[in-house]
């Protein structure tokens, strides 16, 4: 081979390598974004389901409703540590609701006494608190960013 052919071969090889590598990085970026979206959704959904269950004292009716929800889990995304964190958060939230309920006895109409699970859950969502917790937890996974 002449030096001209070697240069052409090296140039073409580098071009192909760089083209394939860039495409792979782009696909990785898309996969990471998709995984992040799925992870955050699963974290928030799990928190919501657990808060409803615990907030309504593991009511059979609530569990039946949650069991019929078509948005079930297809594969395990969250780790055991994630579930432990969610259970801890839900436990704390339930304690807050119980304390609030106890403090409201005699101060609100009879029908308004008790835990306000849906009010509490809506206020958590509106504050974006669970979003920020899920994002912080996602960052601890160490998923590499390609930007």
At which residue positions do the language-model features occur?
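C-terminal motif of bacterial Sec signal peptides marking the signal peptidase cleavage site
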Residues: 18-21
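Soluble non-cytosolic domains of exported or imported proteins
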Residues: 39-43, 56-59, 80, 111-115
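Compact alpha-helical subdomains of small soluble proteins
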Residues: 65-147
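Bacterial N-terminal signal peptides that target proteins for export
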Residues: 2-10
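Post-signal-peptide N-terminal segment of Sec-exported extracytoplasmic proteins
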Residues: 45-68
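Post-signal peptide N-terminal segment of mature Sec-exported envelope proteins
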Residues: 30-49
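Bacterial signal peptide processing site
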Residues: 23-26
């Amino acid at each position: 081979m002449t030096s001209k052919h070697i240069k052409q071969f090296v140039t073409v090889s580098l071009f192909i390598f760089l083209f394939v590598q860039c495409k792979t990085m782009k696909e990785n970026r898309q996969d990471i974004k998709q995984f992040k979206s799925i992870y955050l959704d699963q974290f928030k959904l799990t928190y919501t389901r657990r808060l409803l269950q615990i907030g309504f004292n593991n009511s059979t009716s609530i569990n039946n409703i949650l069991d019929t929800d078509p948005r079930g889990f297809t594969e395990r995304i969250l780790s055991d540590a994630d579930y432990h964190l969610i259970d801890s958060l839900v436990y704390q939230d339930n304690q807050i609701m119980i304390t609030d309920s106890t403090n409201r006895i005699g101060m609100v109409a009879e029908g308004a006494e008790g835990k306000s699970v849906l009010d509490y859950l809506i206020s958590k969502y509106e504050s974006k608190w669970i979003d920020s917790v899920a994002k912080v937890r996602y960052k601890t996974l160490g998923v590499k960013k390609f930007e």
